[in-house]
């Protein structure tokens, strides 16, 4: 998949990561570059009746209880039938809750399809607000149309945490304030030691989008990953937004990159440098060599970090 084209078309949520792990725009319908018939759903057993599903879009987590299923994220609408089939191969029990980690369409595109089957869509309230109103991407200017009522979360929370329980399984939801977006939720299944980060962290070894136009902020991204490092141990299975199953050490590497990027760009912001001046200075050149697939990715990430400090 050509990630440059995806970004220009649809304001990708993981910058130029390449391959099947790359994210699409915050809004369905997705661009017509994807041959949905060729996408396969890969299932990984995480232990204790908990599973990770990979397809096209954000990683999915499935936790099976005695009388139903908790699902975290739902990828794109055209993949719902394949995702349902993959879950049915795990368990015949109904999906009772679908938790959204944030509003971007590669994580929420399946909301309406799963809700029609009886799943209650749960999210931090800012996700509902963003989906209902539509959004604009700060880098590309791409507009996202409002989602239909059937795609909106039916159960939301505003405080810092929420608990979802099904048949002996407990999902602990925590709002990561102003991180990837303003509505990020990370989810922890303590009985399986599985942590789901959404797009506040990734394991693609590429830069991550900071959706500053919709409340994203590198400082919140750093805070979220610090929370993961506190919560995780060496045995924790980390289902990141994109990329293969991660370990605590992967989160630590991603966190270190974010901290370095923040320190360097914040210094230039404090010196009064403009966005163009910061981009021209290439303060992340050494990081770009590892974390950016190309110059466009490097520029976009620098702009996103800069604009974190310019949010109103």
Predicted regions and their residues:
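Metallo-beta-lactamase
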Residues: 45, 68-69, 76-78, 127-260, ...
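Short N-terminal segments immediately surrounding and downstream of signal-peptide cleavage
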Residues: 24-46
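Divalent metal-coordination and catalytic microenvironments
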Residues: 49, 63, 73, 87, ...
């Amino acid at each position: 998949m050509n990630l440059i084209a995806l970004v220009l078309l649809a304001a990708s949520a993981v910058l130029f990561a390449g391959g099947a792990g790359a994210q699409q725009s915050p809004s369905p319908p997705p661009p017509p570059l994807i041959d949905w018939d060729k996408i396969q759903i890969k299932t990984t057993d995480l232990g204790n009746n908990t599973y990770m599903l990979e397809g096209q879009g954000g990683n999915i987590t499935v936790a099976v209880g005695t009388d139903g299923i908790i699902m975290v994220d739902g990828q794109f609408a055209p993949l719902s039938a394949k995702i349902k089939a993959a879950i049915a191969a795990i368990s015949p029990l109904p999906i009772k809750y679908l938790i959204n980690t944030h509003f971007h369409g590669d994580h929420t595109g399946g909301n309406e399809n799963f809700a029609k089957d009886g799943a209650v869509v749960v999210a931090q309230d800012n996700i509902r607000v963003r989906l209902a109103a539509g959004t604009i991407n700060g880098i590309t200017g791409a507009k996202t149309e409002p989602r239909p009522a059937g795609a909106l979360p039916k159960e939301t929370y505003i405080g810092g945490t929420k608990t979802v329980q099904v048949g002996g399984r407990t999902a602990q939801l925590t709002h990561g304030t102003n991180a990837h977006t303003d509505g990020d939720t990370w989810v922890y299944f303590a009985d399986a030691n599985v942590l789901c980060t959404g797009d506040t962290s990734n394991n693609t070894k590429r830069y991550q989008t900071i959706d500053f136009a919709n409340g994203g902020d590198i400082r919140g991204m750093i805070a979220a990953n610090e929370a993961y490092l506190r919560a995780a141990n060496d045995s924790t299975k980390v289902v990141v937004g994109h990329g293969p199953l991660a370990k605590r050490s992967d989160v630590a590497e991603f966190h270190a990159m974010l901290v370095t990027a923040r320190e360097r760009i914040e210094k230039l912001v404090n010196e009064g440098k403009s966005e163009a001046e910061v981009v021209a200075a290439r303060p992340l050149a050494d990081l770009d060599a590892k974390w950016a697939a190309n110059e466009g990715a490097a520029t976009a990430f620098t702009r996103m970090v800069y604009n974190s400090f310019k949010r109103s």
